[in-house]
Amino acid sequence: MTPPPRPAIVIAATPTPNGDLHVGHMAGPYLAGDVYSRYLRGTGRPVVYTTCTDDSQTYVVATAHRQGITPEELVSRSTAKIERSLAAMGTVMTGLPPIDDRYRRTVLDYVTELHAAGRFKLRTVRLPYARNAGVFLFDGLVSGTCPVCMAGSCGGACETCGHPNNFDELLDPKYTVDPTDVVVYREQTILVLPMEDYRERLTAYYASRTPRWRPHAKQLIGELLARPLPEIPVTFPSTWGIAAPFPETAGQILYPWIEAMPASIYATWW
């Protein structure tokens, strides 16, 4: 007897619950994932098409501040809007899984195992800091100029060229919540994932896949591999997010993008 085909897993980009989906969101990852899922199902392949909201993003904090509400309230409102928009578009996505204790346990189990295996390294880094507000700036809390393409960019990665900018690399940083606040730099010891340790494996992985990719994505990977690979933050001195479980970074949170892989795992079985 022939076994049933293995289900395909299609995971759309995780939407940030700092507002409803706009046309660019809908026409981009969610419609594309829906079309691909329908195609696979049309060929007889079972499909799990899913995603989940990335509640820990700093964009939630910045937007909530502008609207005069709490981040928790913004997440609740926005998640409901996102679910309605996905349903109104007629996607075959089964729904958004709840970001609850099961989700947090999945994330913590994932990072704890990597930590125990010695994958993370302690680094003392220089971080932008809003002096009057008393907060460290990263991702959606900081804006400035991309050091690679010189376009306007938030922290973490440039949406124009795709290159990362970590720690103190963003030029002319401003606090997005209050651009008049004075930005200084302070050192903090955090955990990072040193991607350079995995260069050989990453190079082999992308060499086998980028020939099928679109030109812009293929070029970006080539540019990234031609440079020293970044050290991805694992923890960060902040308050909004999942508390880091590691004794050497007490009082810090897990960097939101470290949740991405366990979030994808969680979204497939909830």
Named regions from a protein language model:
Residues V23, V60-A62, A151, E159-T160, ...:
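Short, solvent-exposed loop/turn and secondary-structure capping segments
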